[in-house]
């Protein structure tokens, strides 16, 4: 079901120890070339948690991962719709991948050896989201 006013997306930073998973989409995802974090629009009435599980399974073949919602972004996108982006961290049990039909490439990168921002879709937005959440994950929790 298309909506001309809202865009609801689940966006997943998949981390395994010091590596992050990036994908390239074969269908001109968002009309953008380059690396993405696995993501997709939510289906009608789909909960963001269920969307994250679906995306991991359908896009990269990951069925066993711990998921954590870390941020909800809100902004007006290039298509003038209100975007709500549900950013998740995913911690799969293994690094084994199986790409789905919309994914042309999936690759694990060491966090400190990620492609340049220019090699990411949307002017490096996925890289900035990934680094923000990956670095926050590595920081010890504040004590009270």
What residue ranges belong to the model's regions?
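Conserved N-terminal beta-strand and adjoining loop/helix that marks the start
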Residues: 1-21, 41, 72
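A short coil-to-beta-strand element that immediately follows conserved catalytic motifs
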Residues: 62-71
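Active-site-adjacent beta-strand/loop module that shapes the phosphate/pyrophosphate-binding cleft
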Residues: 73-97
């Amino acid at each position: 079901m298309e909506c001309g006013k809202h865009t609801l997306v689940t966006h997943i930073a998949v981390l395994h120890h010091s590596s992050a998973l990036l994908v390239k989409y074969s269908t001109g995802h968002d009309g953008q070339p380059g690396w993405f974090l696995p993501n997709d629009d939510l289906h009608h009435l789909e909960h963001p948690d269920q969307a994250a599980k679906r995306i991991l399974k359908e896009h990269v073949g990951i069925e066993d991962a711990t998921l954590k919602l870390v941020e909800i972004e809100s902004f007006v996108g290039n298509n003038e719709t209100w975007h709500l982006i549900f950013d998740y961290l995913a911690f799969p049990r293994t690094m084994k991948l199986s790409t789905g039909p919309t994914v042309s490439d999936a690759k694990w990168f060491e966090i400190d050896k990620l492609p340049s921002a220019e090699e990411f879709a949307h002017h490096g937005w996925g890289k900035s989201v990934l680094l923000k959440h990956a670095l926050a994950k590595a920081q010890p929790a504040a004590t009270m």
